[in-house]
Amino acid sequence: MSIKYIGLQNWREDLSSCSKHITLLFLVFQGCWSISEMLKFRSIYAVRELRRFMNWDQENNQIFNKLLLVGFFSLLWWSSMSSLSYAQITPQGRDQTYKQAAPGRFEERFKQKKLPQSQVVPVKPDNLRPVFPAEMRKVKFLLQRMIIKGSTIYDKRKFSRLFRKYLHKRVNLEQVYMIAQEITNMYRADGYILSKAVVPPQKIEEGVVQIDVIEGFVNRVTIQGRVRGPRKLLNEYRKALLRSRPLKARDLERYLLLVDDLPGVSVKSVLTPSKFKQGATNITLIFDTKGYEGSVGADNRGTKFNGPVQINAGVSANSFFKNYERIGLQGVVTSNTDELKFFRGFYEQPISSEGTKLFFSGSFSESEPGSALKSFEVAGESKTFTLRLTHPFVRSRSENLNGFVGYTNRDSETKILGELDSEDRLRIVNLGMSYDFVDAYRGINLVSFNLSKGFDIFDSTKTGTAKLTRLAGHSDFTKVTGEMLRLQQLAPSWMLLGELSWQYSFDKLLASEEFGVGGAKFGRAYDSSEITGDQGLAFKLELQKAFQPKKKYLRDLQAYAFFDYGKVWNRIETTAGSKTQDLDSLGIGIRFNITDMISGYMEWNKPLNRKVASEGNKDGRAFFSLTAKF
């Protein structure tokens, strides 16, 4: 019998185990031979008696004895091999099961990547200076006093800095208009985009000049297009814009983006000056709504145990109950559906006009890994429920600050050879934030932080309970995780992406809470969660070059090359006898948009410092993904 080595036991242990079984078989053989001789004697006697009636000969008697002996040895061989298979379930094999095939880690594996909301907005530099008629320079007078009317934002001292140097001096009319322009610039610099200063028609007497400030505001908001949800929420956004007097750019941007963030809603705004009120502006919101969204795709990012081909599909309904809610389903299966099944449903609901959202999700996953783990009859399942409250403290095109608080309830169990091997029931409270922004160098940045705390509540498995995924793991753990990302334009069509992810734990963790390296995000030449630990650090650098072929069936193309590295630290030694593990890889690839709906990537990756556990080598590997959205 040939047993494939998968890191479960070294060859000396295999040899020792096999030699013990061979010795046992030899002793059993001797005993069975003695029994067979006795059986032979009795069978001969029985046959002689039967020959009196049936005329059997000696040859038939020998065949009967041989069949009896072969059947007996077959039973012993089957029993021996069953015992031998069970002996192969070593700590190393158990570790590999919980790294790459345990359903408790699928939630993290299939989680959608968080992307920055900020974007670089093209802005043309304002190099144009106002041009005034030359005749203005000829109109000169002694400036004794300047009156600024109409401002509700700034006090007199703020304005006096702008014209103090001109007082009690001879000035021309052009200089007066320049002062008005400086007041306008001051308002615009502070975000009052509709406000301005003007010099009204007047007769200058005794050196007194008046400048009027027109503080712009929103007078009316109208909506065009189909509205799928209640107008009550839209009215709240409308009132917020009307309250912003004078109108600030950050208020206009925030509430327009919050409307655009509603599920299935895409909005454009048109600003027009009012014909009846000075300083008033009317806003028209043009709605484009989508009732549902979906996608279907395939990739080979699975493992030999679960995959490698994965088929994923998702669909979400927007405002199905006419309340601006979003309801969605996601599913992932492998080509052999018994090896992996993952299903997730979610519900998201806005609960305030300031962008606060309530989010529910529930997922179920099932795993019966194949390949070298198939003979161990590994079977696991996981159920996760999540409740989260999110709020955008800052929402704009160039800067966003989001906070959240959440609760996760996760139950998972794994059986090996039909026996319960582990059972984790975790109750976790999360608190976190994410901040993304565009800096002065036109780089897009993302920083996120998450604090997770486990509690022994609601029938959780307590620390020290038997049959945990990691016997020393804590269910009442505390850990912090974080991510950093920067996307920098180097030149037209050239970009450099840098990304860092980390985790620090104050306790020994259970398997589903460990930091994993390997898979589509970090350690791309390796399988998902190739190495795991209580603490971890991973980073990648990716150079990107964009092309625009503008072909009918090839809209966009991006070539890239990357290097990534990851390391994990454990608070206790692993079964390999080490507290640290690391890996690195490099690769090249292309991303493409075939049409507006179909996209994908192809890449070739090379493991560098360690072998891929499931492959047993460091050969290059090819990966692909193809997705259709509708």
Language-model segments: residues:
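Repeated loop/turn-to-beta-strand initiation elements of outer-membrane beta-barrel proteins
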Residues: 267, 292-294, 321-327, 353-359, ...
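Residues that define the transmembrane beta-barrel architecture of outer-membrane proteins
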Residues: 279, 307-311, 339-343, 381-385, ...
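Membrane-embedded beta-strands of outer-membrane beta-barrel proteins
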Residues: 283, 313-315, 345, 387, ...
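Extracellular loop and loop/strand-boundary signature of outer-membrane beta-barrel proteins
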Residues: 299-301, 331-332, 371-376, 415-421, ...
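C-terminal outer-membrane beta-barrel translocator/porin domains of Gram-negative envelope proteins
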Residues: 413-557, 562-565, 569-571
